[in-house]
Amino acid sequence: YTTYMTGQMLKTNFSLNDKYTLFEGRVILSGIQALVRLLLDQHRADLIKGINTGTLVSGYRGSPVGTLDINLVKNKKLLDEHNVKFIPGVNEDLGATLIYGSQMAGMVSNVKYDGVLGMWYGKAPGVDRSGDIFRHANFLGVGKNGGVLAVAGDDPSCKSSTLPSQSEPALFDAMMPIFYPGNVQEILDLGRYAYEMSRYSGLWSGFKIVTDIADGFGSAFVDPQRVNITIPDFTYNGKPWKHTQNAKLVGHHSLP
């Protein structure tokens, strides 16, 4: 139902769950809630393209992404409906290794989904300690119709940290393209670009979230057609670029 006030249409059947379930319109949500919504939106976008994907989320709590796990658990039923599985990590390294393994799903037979997406999350110190997994994951490459976001929680003002943090150098060193959303709208929009960048390049996409964005609330416009991504017409060695995986991470196979 709608009513008209000062020439504007007012939605009267509002639900707190609209921030996750509304397909088209305006929603209000926090930065952490936007990360949850991003998982759902990416799955919906893949279904529109005829791709049935599953998603694995793992990592370790730590501000400013410390409440992501709570929000994932609270919305388990909704996540299950969108093929999203959450397995918290004992630490950041094990969470990253779990996501690393998810990208090998296409290497085995009888797979359940057309592709597996991943989302790793951790505070800046977790980015530091998980660098070895990040590098190995990027040498392997993401799976077909897959893609991974490495959500790095930075606390530059030390709101709840002993030291200020800036994760870009570590993410760059791990060969990741980096996205840095400045509000909840950009989490939803740039998140879609980040997944497509990962899928196209074969690399994990770094996704930097600072305290003010994670803890803050804002409004965002949602629409299945809002983000229209054009895949580059890029050739490599005279052939159209297509990412392929390489699991031979030993000896001369890892050298140029």
Language-model segments: residues:
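Thiamine diphosphate
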Residues: 63-199, 210
